[in-house]
């Protein structure tokens, strides 16, 4: 079972944001065959909150598209808590425009990308990046979206 707590903390036009159901579809697709039960939060924020979190946790003083905060449970505690995603609506919209992507498709990519980070995937090393990108491409193609790269 999938439980998603969606927090809308952005001033972005709600008509430009995905529906709760769409977030659920994208997360389920990323989790497919990787995790059967999960709880996570998705917080939609403005650039100021994204920038503050990016500075605090990554040392980068700029807003970013998605931040992933995996849940770190103590040993012996077995709960399906995956973690939190913080997605900046303005950055996602700006990137979609700059990259010539449909806004909906870029949102899907950011949710899948962030969810894979929560599962432990990363793109720091070339080999890890190739693996993660291949999974993203496959998941997005299965959802009917084009290759985001």
From Swiss-Prot:
Record's keyword terms, sorted: Cytoplasm, Endonuclease, Hydrolase, Metal-binding, Nuclease, Ribosome biogenesis, rRNA processing, Zinc
Class of enzymatic activity (EC top level): hydrolase
GO biological process, one term: rRNA processing
GO CC, one annotated term: cytoplasm
Gene Ontology MF terms: metalloendopeptidase activity; RNA endonuclease activity; zinc ion binding
PROSITE patterns recorded: UPF0054
Subcellular localization: Cytoplasm
Binding positions for Zn(2+) per the UniProt entry: 113, 117, 123
CC cofactor: Zn(2+)
Signal peptide: none
Cofactor mode of binding and number, as noted: Binds 1 zinc ion.
Pfam families referenced in this protein's UniProt entry, alphabetically: YbeY
Similarity section: Belongs to the endoribonuclease YbeY family.
Summary of the function given for this chain in its UniProt record: Single strand-specific metallo-endoribonuclease involved in late-stage 70S ribosome quality control and in maturation of the 3' terminus of the 16S rRNA.
Protein name: Endoribonuclease YbeY
Provenance organism: Saccharophagus degradans (strain 2-40 / ATCC 43961 / DSM 17024)
């Amino acid at each position: 079972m999938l439980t998603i707590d969606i927090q809308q903390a952005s001033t972005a036009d709600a008509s430009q944001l995905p529906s709760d159901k769409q977030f659920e579809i994208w997360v389920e697709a990323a989790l497919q065959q990787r995790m059967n039960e999960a709880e996570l939060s998705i917080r939609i924020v403005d650039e100021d909150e994204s920038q503050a979190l990016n500075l605090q946790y990554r040392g980068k003083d700029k807003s970013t598209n998605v931040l992933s905060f995996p849940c770190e449970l103590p040993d012996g505690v077995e709960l399906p808590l995956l973690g939190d995603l913080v997605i900046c609506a303005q950055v996602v919209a700006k990137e979609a425009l700059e990259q010539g992507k449909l806004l909906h498709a870029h949102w899907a990519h950011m949710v899948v990308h962030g969810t894979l980070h929560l599962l432990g995937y990363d793109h720091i090393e070339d080999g890890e990046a190739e693996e993660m990108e291949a999974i993203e491409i496959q998941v997005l193609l299965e959802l009917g979206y084009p290759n985001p790269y």
